[in-house]
Amino acid sequence: CNGLFLYTPPDKFPKLRTVQLTSAGLDRVPMDYMDAHGIKVFNARGVYSAPMAEFAVCSVLGFYKRSAFFSAAQSEHRWEKHRGLEELGGKRVVIVGAGSVGRACADRFRAFGCEIIGVDRRTAVDGFDKIYSIGDIRAAVSAGDIVIFCLPLTKETEHIANAELLCAMKD
């Protein structure tokens, strides 16, 4: 179930007792209703950790290696060199959310020689060179070269990546 309750209210299912989501976030489920009616909701935490982490690496590599530029040049039969491409080694990657997706990202970026900084509610999480508490997110983000948000969408996380926080990033 993912999005069913956007179109059909849960009271249309009078025998509903359990919901299994295909996502980690609960943003598409009326949790107040579920809690009030004793309906158990299970998410798919961890199921997409590897593909999400690989997508994050792909996106960062695409940015640093200017993949869109070279793809466009290739389609125009232009074989340009670009000597200003940066490498990931030595970059400081800030991963906001040290759950299964965040830890999978940390593992993959570490393979490129990156320093891995985490931001999480828990301040003791394996796989990170340093962990900041969620209250110190601005300090963590301002120290990073790359910032990746690995949080399920919930009431608590919905507006965490706002303009003020993103403006705190390094140039």
Question: At which residue positions do the language-model features occur?
Answer:
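Conserved beta-strand positions in the Rossmann-like core of class I SAM-dependent methyltransferases
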Residues: 117
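Glycine-rich Rossmann-fold phosphate-binding loop(s) that bind the pyrophosphate
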Residues: 98-99
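An N-terminal-biased, well-structured beta-alpha scaffold segment characteristic
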Residues: 1-40, 167
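N-terminal Rossmann-fold NAD(P) dinucleotide-binding loop
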Residues: 102-103
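Short, well-ordered alpha-helix to beta-strand connector turns
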Residues: 1, 13-16, 113, 128-129, ...
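Phosphate-binding beta-alpha-beta segment of Rossmann-like dinucleotide-binding domains, i.e.
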Residues: 39, 44-92, 107
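Surface-exposed amphipathic alpha-helices with a cationic face
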Residues: 106-110, 170
